[in-house]
């Protein structure tokens, strides 16, 4: 009888021990699930919390190792300790990897931590952005788009350098395109039928002054040359949502009214007093209608100078606008990536594809050869 009792007690003890072990494992799993995103994370202190964030720039940028992006920010200079490096030997320390969309063949070796996609090019020239399978591999976006997780448009706050006075502007329309995208060049060609356009770029060039100084600072030279023109053609290479680049900054800096062809969302890049600083091609039925308006303004100093009000009044209130937040950011863009990671602001199911239809002649009311 005693032997039977001992066996029963031993069996019950064994069952109780197994139960306790299972309970501990379940509890550890629950804690782990609460503290880790599905794509993985790195904890770097004793209680499992992350105290510093290391992002490895895994790809090149247009084939060049981007060593210029490297830097580190201690807590205080950034809400979290943050480091960005191109040192791939530190792969086991990584909190995230960043990949440039135009160098998308360089994929990180592990998906145990988030992947960040960086681009300042639009989907027409970067087809992977419209590839659902490719985009689903990434968990955070840093791009030119103002609706990106981390907006990083190629468009800086314009300066308030006074413009050349109206009476001293000797040129009418300035243009300098290096990419001869066919629709914008056809529009410019038709515009030239009704109004003089001085073209310094590689497309329909009729002026050579800019070519002579191309070996210096090209963008600075372009800005300085355009200062004596009343208008500058700012025709972006496609009409993709939010695609705005430094062409518009250069024209605004020069005090030469930008004549803009591109995204319907351009107003989101023109907060405060900049709202009335540009002329939008889309507001005109044809190149002839646009030409008539530009000629009218060129002979009306008061109306023309209304586009320059922001130069004297300042940019104005840009609080609460996405582009204003970008211009007035307290922390560098690299730090903002670390903050997004620390707050768990990642897309665990991946990013959505970004569609963009290639520009067509009919989008701008023109017929080729007309």
Put a short name on every predicted segment.
Residues 2-99, 103-118, 129-370:
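Pol beta-like nucleotidyltransferase catalytic core
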Residues 121-124:
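Catalytic toxin/effector domains delivered as secreted proteins or via bacterial secretion systems
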């Amino acid at each position: 009888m005693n032997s039977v009792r001992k066996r029963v007690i031993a069996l019950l003890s064994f069952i109780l021990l197994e139960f306790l072990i299972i309970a501990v494992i379940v509890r550890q799993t629950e804690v782990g699930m609460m503290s880790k995103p599905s794509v993985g994370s790195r904890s770097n202190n004793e209680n499992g919390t992350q105290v510093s964030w290391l992002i490895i720039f895994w790809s090149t940028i247009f084939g060049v190792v981007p060593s210029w992006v490297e830097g580190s920010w201690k807590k205080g200079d950034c809400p979290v300790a943050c480091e960005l490096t191109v040192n791939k030997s530190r792969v086991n320390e990584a909190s995230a990897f960043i990949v440039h969309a135009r160098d998308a063949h360089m994929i990180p070796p592990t998906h145990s931590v988030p992947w960040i996609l960086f681009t300042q090019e639009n989907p027409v020239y970067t087809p992977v952005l419209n590839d659902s399978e490719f985009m689903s591999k990434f968990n955070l976006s840093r791009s030119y788009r103002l609706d990106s997780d981390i907006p990083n448009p190629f468009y800086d706050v314009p300066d308030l350098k006074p413009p050349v006075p109206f009476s001293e502007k000797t040129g009418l329309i300035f243009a300098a395109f290096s990419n001869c995208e066919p629709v914008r060049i056809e529009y410019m060609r038709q515009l030239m039928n009704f109004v003089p356009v001085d073209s310094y770029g590689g497309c329909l060039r009729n002026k050579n002054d800019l070519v002579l100084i191309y070996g210096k600072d090209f963008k600075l030279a372009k800005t300085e040359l355009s200062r004596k023109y009343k208008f500058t053609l700012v025709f972006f290479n496609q009409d993709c949502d939010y695609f705005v680049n430094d062409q518009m900054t250069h024209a605004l800096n020069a005090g030469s009214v930008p004549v803009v062809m591109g995204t319907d969302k351009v107003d989101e890049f023109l907060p405060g007093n900049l709202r009335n600083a540009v002329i939008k091609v889309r507001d005109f039925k044809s190149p002839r209608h646009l030409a008539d308006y530009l000629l009218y303004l060129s002979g009306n100093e008061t109306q023309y100078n209304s586009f320059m009000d922001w130069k004297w009044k300042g940019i104005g209130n840009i609080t609460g606008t996405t582009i204003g937040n970008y211009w007035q950011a307290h922390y560098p863009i690299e730090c903002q990536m670390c903050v997004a990671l620390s707050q768990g602001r990642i897309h665990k199911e991946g990013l959505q594809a970004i569609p963009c239809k290639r520009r067509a002649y009919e989008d701008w009311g023109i017929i080729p050869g007309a």
